UniProtKB/Swiss-Prot annotation:
Belongs to the D-isomer specific 2-hydroxyacid dehydrogenase family. PdxB subfamily. Its EC number is 1.1.1.290. Substrate binds at residues 45, 66. GO terms for cellular component: cytosol. The keyword Cytoplasm applies. It is an enzyme of class 1 (oxidoreductase). The gene is pdxB. It catalyses: 4-phospho-D-erythronate + NAD(+) = (R)-3-hydroxy-2-oxo-4-phosphooxybutanoate + NADH + H(+). Homodimer. Keywords: Cytoplasm, NAD, Oxidoreductase, Pyridoxine biosynthesis. It is found in: Cytoplasm. This is Erythronate-4-phosphate dehydrogenase.
Length: 350
């Protein structure tokens, strides 16, 4: 079975041994020619999967090595009987680490006003963030009405409950499905109800926060974001306004990248009735000196202010966004820097 895969994905050789044959693409414009006689297209969320890309090709599977699937035209793929494989949950730990790194920076700058936090979206990522904040004794409001309709053991808070929060963490999937669409959920009416000094950390999708409404908001809201409308052609005004702004890398730890490939591989092997291969894993990092507080430890692993300043000072914002995102490949999950006993001392770190 022939696979065309994004060259930036790690561990492909071990994840797809014979009977698979893997061909790599480095740029999207290489795909139309390379896709001939391929059975599987294995991509990242940066690639738009639609009829324009796949016309005149006979692939059987589209596999995305990411949790999000809003870059995929599901109706088109279904009309062509193309199966879709995703890697949901692969980066949940990595995104939770990112949120903690943002909190570490904000806390050092004395910008966190209180410990009442709202989490919007309680999927695998939001649940990991909940576990961290709950262990650190935040008072939590959990907002996910669709989950409440599916899971009777879960009770969602109301939108009005979120207005009393000092911190909002956005982890919902982007969708427009009634009665609870996430598209433009955080709009003008929502924003004007927030407490002055409220912090929004958006590590989900740009379309959930209405950027125009945010830009025209009169009150002092601190916006920290990893995601934007129209990536990579992001709005320079949002970059200027944001307290922290990073190039869509919250889920990009080394462990998350390897996990994404492994999840896709397992699903494909299972669908084809093949035994699982042995998967590659990243090398473990050095151990950290634990004679520091949680903020220093988190920021020694990843400090979001560095990429923030790179974006804020960029001449060509789109180019800087893509370059920074591509070069973000040295961060490990926080827990890999500690042994299991040590991590218990730092509940926010894992």
């Amino acid at each position: 079975m022939n696979i065309l895969a994004d060259a930036l994905l790690p561990g492909l050789d071990s994840a797809f041994p014979p009977p698979f044959t893997v061909t790599l693409y480095h740029k999207a414009d290489e795909i139309p020619e390379l896709l001939h006689y391929k059975d599987v297209l294995l991509c990242r969320s940066t690639l738009k999967i639609n009829g324009d890309l796949l016309k005149n090709h006979q692939i059987k599977f589209v596999a995305t090595a990411t949790s999000g699937t809003d870059h995929i035209d599901f109706p088109f793929l279904e009309s062509q009987n193309i199966s879709i494989i995703d890697a949901k949950g692969c980066n949940a730990i990595s995104v939770a680490d990112y949120v903690v790194a943002c909190l570490a920076y904000l806390d050092k700058q004395q910008l966190i006003q209180g410990k009442t936090a709202g989490i919007i979206g309680l999927g695998q990522v939001g649940t990991k963030v909940y576990e961290r904040l709950n262990a650190a004794e935040f008072q939590l409001c959990l907002y996910d009405p669709p989950k409440a309709t599916r899971d009777t053991s879960f009770q969602s808070c109301s939108l009005e409950d979120l207005f009393e929060c000092d911190l909002l963490c956005v982890h919902a999937e982007l969708h427009s499905d009634a009665p609870y669409p996430s598209l433009n959920l955080i709009n003008r009416d929502f924003l004007k109800e927030l407490k002055p000094g409220c912090i929004i950390i958006n590590a989900s999708r740009g379309g959930i926060v209405n950027e125009e409404a945010l830009l025209h908001l009169g009150s002092a809201i601190l916006y920290c974001t990893d995601v934007y409308n129209n990536e990579p052609h992001i709005d320079s005004r949002i970059v200027s306004k944001a307290t922290l702004c990073t190039p869509h890398i919250a889920g990009h730890s080394l462990e998350a990248k390897f996990a994404a490939v492994a999840i896709v591989s397992r699903k494909l092997h299972q669908m084809l009735g093949l035994p699982y291969p042995q998967f590659a894993t990243p090398e473990k990092p050095y151990r950290l000196n634990e004679n520091s507080d949680w903020r220093e430890l988190a920021l020694s692993i990843y400090n979001p202010i560095h990429e923030t300043l790179e974006l804020k000072h960029a001449g060509n914002l789109s180019s800087a966004f893509l370059t920074l995102r591509k070069n973000h490949h040295h961060r490990h999950d926080f827990t890999t820097y500690f042994d299991s006993d040590s991590i218990k001392k730092y509940p926010l770190l894992g």
